């Protein structure tokens, strides 16, 4: 069972305040012409709007319950014919089609615990791409201020939904816990610095084209958030 299974039904309310990335990834999908593979597709928060823009999406996720929600969302919004969902691992996705764009939104690569796992996921993305295809994803590396403000405190993220961040700065690991009245789960996020991502992407067969500091495409200036656009090398 995935650690996201218990919160599949509250995931969208929990992440309701995160909206800026949706338009960004829809624009990337439209520019690619599709189809698009989304790694860690979750509840379809990104995939369904991409499908509503007329682009076919092939999604993979380790949480069957999140995929169930994604199917419901696609059906309710009339785009189930454009959303193909698979249960599987980001490091070995059960997808055989080659596409012009692979995306991995909402910092999902940080679920990979070590550099070896992250590199395996990057190589899996590389294998899914057409020649000169692009891989677009976002991650973060926390600021000292963010760690100090949130460490070890339960905060109400949305009405009735609480989250707690426990930071292990030397180990560069965030243990994030989410709870509501009847569900609770915890999972780890493992961050890297910008230079470390550059090295991993190079080893994974990618050329970094752009790194932005947010989804409005502001230049990256050693900030917390990193949004990468990378081209597949042959």
Q: What are the roles of these predicted feature ranges?
A:
Residues 94-101:
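A short acidic, Gly/Pro-enriched loop at the edge of an enzyme's catalytic core
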Residues 45:
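Conserved SAM/SAH-binding loop-helix junction
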Residues 194-234:
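C-terminal lobe and adjacent flexible extensions of AdoMet/dcAdoMet transferase-like proteins
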């Amino acid at each position: 069972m995935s650690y996201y299974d218990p919160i599949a039904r509250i995931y969208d309310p929990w992440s309701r305040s995160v909206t800026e990335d949706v338009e960004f990834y829809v624009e990337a999908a439209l520019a690619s012409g599709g189809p698009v593979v989304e790694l860690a597709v979750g509840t379809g928060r990104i995939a369904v709007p991409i499908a509503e823009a007329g682009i076919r999406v092939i999604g993979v996720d380790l949480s069957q319950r999140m995929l169930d929600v994604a199917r419901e969302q696609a059906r309710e919004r009339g785009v189930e014919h454009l959303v193909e969902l698979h249960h599987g691992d980001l490091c070995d996705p059960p997808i055989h089609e080659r596409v012009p764009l692979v995306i991995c939104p909402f910092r999902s690569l940080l679920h990979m615990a070590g550099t070896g796992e992250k590199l395996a996921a990057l190589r899996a993305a590389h294998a899914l791409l057409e020649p000169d295809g692009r891989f677009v994803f976002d991650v973060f590396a926390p600021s000292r201020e963010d760690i100090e403000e949130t460490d070890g405190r339960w905060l109400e993220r949305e009405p009735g939904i609480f989250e707690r961040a426990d930071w292990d700065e030397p180990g560069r690991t965030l243990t994030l816990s989410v709870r509501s009245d009847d569900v609770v789960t915890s999972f780890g996020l493992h961050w890297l610095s910008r230079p470390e991502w550059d090295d991993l992407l190079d080893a994974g067969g990618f050329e970094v084209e752009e790194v932005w500091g947010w989804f409005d495409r502001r230049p990256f200036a050693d900030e917390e958030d990193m949004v990468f656009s990378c081209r597949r090398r042959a």
